Amino acid sequence: MSLVHPDTSNYPFRFAPFLRQEYSFSLDPDRPVCQYYNSKEGASSCPNGTLCPNKHVLPIFQNKIVCKHWLRGLCKKNDQCEYLHEYNLRKMPECVFFTKNGYCTQSPECQYLHIDPTSKVQQCEDYRMGFCPLGTACPCKHVKKIICPKYVTGFCPLGRDCDWEHPPFYVPNELSKIRIKRDDEINTKKLDEEKERRLNAIINGELVI
């Protein structure tokens, strides 16, 4: 048995069945799809219910990208998750670090997709200038620039269907409120804290002078 990678198969836990039933922990991601499961009737259509060792996959959740939380073992939705719970390199989420910086520190071991920026759909220049004659048939991307006044005030009932832009909110700059302390102030505070700790230790009998 290795100290770095010990064999724990002989040490079962009483809560292991609960984790397997509720969160599908320790289940083979390549296990077959249950032939008895009916998406319309739910888990009751399978005689094994939530204890079934096979997958219960809803049709509307197929052909999705891989769940990023499942990759880290943190997804709690089990088979009800709207993302894939399997290793599929073609359906992995896009690497945020690579998209933002143009490179990835985890490459080539990174599990996420590294998409070439030049392969993405380019922004439509006609739409950016104010009008695109092709409309929805345009092969380029139409980026909304007019900010939605309802969204800025707090809520837009149209959501993603709104014709105006919903920009992300930014945290106000707090640099003006930051006060820079001198080294002597920091050292004095540390000295006072040390004296207070020693005094409390003496009072509690933890330190004898």
UniProtKB/Swiss-Prot annotation:
Subcellular location: Nucleus
Zn-finger segments (C3H1-type): 28-59, 61-88, 89-117, 118-145, 147-169
Assigned keywords, A-Z: Metal-binding, mRNA processing, Nucleus, Repeat, RNA-binding, Zinc, Zinc-finger
An annotated Gene Ontology molecular function: RNA binding
Alphabetical list of SMART domains matching this protein: ZnF_C3H1 (SM00356)
PANTHER family assigned: CLEAVAGE AND POLYADENYLATION SPECIFICITY FACTOR SUBUNIT 4 (PTHR23102:SF24), CLEAVAGE AND POLYADENYLATION SPECIFICITY FACTOR SUBUNIT 4-RELATED (PTHR23102)
Recorded family membership: Belongs to the CPSF4/YTH1 family.
Protein name: mRNA 3'-end-processing protein YTH1
Protein's gene: YTH1
